[in-house]
Design a protein with these regions (language model features):
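Flexible interhelical turns and helix-capping residues at alpha-helix boundaries
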Residues: 32, 50, 140-143, 147, ...
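Conserved lysine of the Walker
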Residues: 36
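A conserved P-loop NTPase coupling/switch region
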Residues: 106-111, 119-195
């Protein structure tokens, strides 16, 4: 798969841009501030529907413009594909695939696939667990686009269940019929959260298992470190003790329900959901020690490019 053309309208510093590309290596060169990173960011956005530099879309639209348009012509095993995204800050983005409007932005995922290595990727080692979860989910969606819908479903249920926990906590200790009603409502949301979370959890665990040997081999090739000082990755799920689990979806759903029941009192006290994929961690270790706390700055870079 490779790009044959990239066209931008009002994206970042570019009022209009159209460049022809081809197979093989393409290098963008020029003085600082000329927009080289903006080109890479645009390609990444077309592939993932997100920027590696900012969390919202507003900075992506050129100052004074209402919207930005990104287009990429892609050649791959399935032939030629035209991917188009219209970025509308504050409104729904619009996407087209081969000029046909798609009902949801995520419907274009998989049409263009990329691997990015940027300074921001150091957060994969040094950043918060949320950065590593986001990386896992982006990679999961890139390999199997259906996970975009599964992740969206889980996040929707999580928001609604969290709102219920906060509401219940603000009412103090309920009694009688009110308590029974709240318990029944929480039971229903627990079931929905487990049903939505189990497939996402299973996908993440399978992905980590598939990545593990490649990460170890890539780290050794990049670092040139002493024998035995390898990089390992593992997935720590909040719904299990001692990381003893199976990655079949029905079993994970049961495990989530059990874990949710075990922390319900604490969740009501704190008004937050304490277990589930949103609380899990992708752990990286170098030489048997956590990379986040023990690796030097230079060592922290080695596991980062190895993900490609």
């Amino acid at each position: 798969m490779y790009l044959t053309r990239l066209a931008l309208t009002d994206f970042r510093s570019y009022p209009e841009l159209s460049i022809e590309l081809g197979p093989g290596v393409t290098t963008f060169s020029g003085p600082n501030g000329e927009g080289k990173t903006n080109l890479v960011e645009a390609i990444g956005y077309l592939a993932t529907l997100g920027s590696h530099r900012v969390a919202t879309d507003s900075p992506l639209v050129r100052r004074g413009a209402d919207a930005a348009v990104l287009r990429a012509a892609v050649t791959g095993a399935q032939g030629n594909t035209l991917v188009e995204i219209e970025i509308n800050p504050g409104r729904a983005n619009r996407v087209r695939l081969n000029r046909a409007p798609m009902p949801r932005p995520r419907d274009i995922l998989g049409a263009l696939r990329t691997v990015l290595f940027a300074p921001e990727d150091l957060a994969l080692v040094k950043g918060d667990p949320g950065e590593r979860r986001r990386f896992l989910d982006e990679l999961l969606v890139a390999t199997a686009p259906r996970y975009a819908g599964l992740r969206a479903d889980y996040e929707r249920v999580l928001r609604q269940r969290t709102a219920l926990l906060k509401s219940a906590g603000s009412k103090g200790h309920l009694r009688g019929a009110a308590r029974e009603s709240m318990t029944a409502t929480l039971d229903a949301w627990d079931a929905q959260l487990a049903q939505a979370g189990a497939p996402l959890l299973a996908g993440r665990m399978r992905l980590v298992a598939a990545l593990r040997p490649h990460v170890t081999a890539a780290y050794e090739a990049v670092s040139g470190g002493p024998p035995g000082e390898s990089c390992e990755i593992s997935y720590r799920a909040s719904v299990f003790n001692n990381n003893e689990f199976d990655n079949d979806v029905p079993g994970l759903e049961v495990a989530m329900l059990k874990a949710l029941a075990g922390v319900r009192a604490s969740e009501l006290d704190r008004g937050v959901c304490l277990v589930g994929p949103h609380r899990d961690e992708l752990e990286l270790s170098v030489g048997g020690l956590p990379a986040r706390g023990y690796a030097s700055h230079d060592e922290s870079w080695s596991p980062t490019p190895s993900r490609s």
